[in-house]
Amino acid sequence: KAVIKVTAYSGKPWVNITYRIINTSDDELKIKSLVFYIKKSEDSVITEQLKPLKIAAGNDSTGCGDIRTDNSHNDGPVFMTRGTTELDMIEKKADVNNIRTVVATSNYKTSFIIGKNGEEVNEVIDDKYLVKEANEHFAEVFYGTFMADYTDGEDGFSVTVHQAQQNYPKAVKSCSEGVAVMLVPENVWEITMQSGMAKEQQFMIHFHSPAMKLWEIDNRSLIYQMPDRPYIAPEVFKRAGVMIDVFPVKYNDDFEISLMAKADGHSRCYGMLNWGDTVDQGYTVQGRGGGKPVWSNNEYDYPHACALMYARTGVRRFMDYLIVSAKHWMDIDVCHYSSNPLRIGGQWEHTAGHCKNGVMVCSHEWVEGLLDYYHFTGDKRGYDTAIGIGENVLKLLETPMYQVPGEANARETGWALRTLTALYVETNDNKWLVKCDWIIDNFKKWEEEYGDWLSPYTDNTAIRVGFMISIAVGSVMRYYRIFPREDIRQMILRAVDDLTENCYMDNGLFYYKELP
C-alpha cells in the first residue's frame, strides 16, 4: 500500500511531496528501486541508470568546507565547484538556453556538479559516502542538502530530498530530459521492510525561472532542510499548564548541563529504516537479538523527553530530536498490518530488525511523545498513532498475562496506566478510564497481598525492582493529578517510602533491582 500527499502553498513556487509505503503482506518486502521522474515534457524519457562521473573533489578532512576549487580553465562539459564563489563564472559557461543540469550536496558549503548542453550529472549517497565525510552537525537539525536541478531557456525546476544523507541510500540525477529522484536507487543498498512496517519520505519541487541564480536555488534547498522553528518561552509553557511542571523557579547549571548532554549524546543510526532510532548496546551484548543488533524502538518514550526539554529550554534542536524520532516511531516501530489482531496499531518492544520476531507488551507502549509531536506539528498521524497504541493496550490488558495482580512486574500495568491516562487527558473519552480504575484496584490488591509492589523473579523469589516500581509510581501519580483521592496518595507515599528504605544506597543512588 502506498500513500502520496502533495502539499502546495498559496503564492509560493514550490510543492512538498510525501510518499509513504506500507508492507501489507505477511512476507518481507525487498524494495528493488523507488524512483520519481520530473520530466521537461510528457514525452520525455528518463532512465534510472547512473552514468559514471570522473570527478575527484577530495575529502573534506577539516569538516569546514575549506577545500578550494578552480574552474577558470575548465570548459566542461562538467564542472565541479564547492561553495558559491565560482557559480557566476560557471553559469556563463553552462548556458541555460542549451540546458543546464545540476546536482548538489552539502556538508558545510554546497558541492555542485554542473553540466552544460544537457550533460548528465548525478550524485549517490551510500554508506561509503557518509564515512568519508566529516560532518559535525546535529543531524536531526541539519546535515546538508541533496538536490538536482534542470533549467532550459523556458523553465526550471529543482528537487530537494529531505534528510537524504540521514535516510540513505539516495540518488539524484539531472539530464537533458529532466530529473530522476531515487528514494531507493537500484543496486546501491538492500532495503527490506518487515511485514506491517511503513516508511514515509519527502521531497520538494521548486519551480523557477531560467534567470534564477544557482545560489538562490541552493538557498531555497537549504531552507527546506533546516526551516525556521517556532519558539515559545519556557515561562509561557509554565503559565499555560499544558505540560507537567518541569519548570523550576531556579535552574541548577550542573543539572541542566547533564540533561543537555544526555539529550545531545544519544547515538544516531543512519539509514532509511534506522534514522530516528538507535541500537541498544546493552541489550545487544546480552544476546536479546540472537547475536544481531537490538533496536531500542525509542525506549522509554525518548520523544516525550525531547518535547519536555524543548518546552523547558526553548532550544530548537530538542524539537528536531522530537520530530525525527516520532516520525520513525510512527512508521517503523508500530504495526500497520498483521493477521494477528493483537498486533494491529501496537508498538513493538525493542528487538532485532526493529520489529522482526518482536513482541508487544504494555510495558513497551507509550503515547505521550506522539501527542507532543501532534501538538507541536499539527500532523494528525501523531494523534492517530497514539490512539492506535491505546487501543492495542486495551486489548492486551484483556489477555491472561494481566489478570492476576503481582504476576507481572509493576511497570507492565504502570505503563498501561500512564498511556491510558494521557489519552483520557487528550480526548476526554471515558473509555480510557475503565482500565485505569481496574489497574489502580490491582495495585491495591498487589500491595495487600505482597506487602509491597514486589515482582516475580526466579522461581523461588519475588523482589523489588526499583526502576519498575518508580515507573508505576510515576504513572499512578499522573492518574492522581487528574483524579485526586487520598487512598491513591497514601499508596504512592508508601511505595516511595519502601523504595527509599530498601533500594537507596549510601552513595545517593537507587539500585535497579534487589537480585542478584
Model-based region annotation:
Residues 212, 249-252, 310-323, 373-387, ...:
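Structural helix-adjacent loops and short alpha-helical linkers that scaffold large soluble proteins
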Residues 15, 254-316, 320-329:
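Conserved, compact domain cores that house catalytic/ligand-binding motifs in diverse enzymes
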Residues 231, 258-275, 321-337, 380-401, ...:
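Long, well-ordered core segments of solenoidal/helical folds
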Residues 293-311, 359-374, 407-424, 461-480, ...:
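Well-ordered alpha-helical segments within folded domains of soluble proteins
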Residues 1-230, 235, 274-278, 297, ...:
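Beta-strand/loop-rich accessory regions of lumenal/periplasmic or secreted enzymes
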Residues 213-238, 246, 250, 254, ...:
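Terminal, non-catalytic domain-edge segments
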Residues 213, 219-290, 334-342:
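Low-complexity, Ser/Thr/Pro/Gly-enriched N-terminal "stalk/linker" regions
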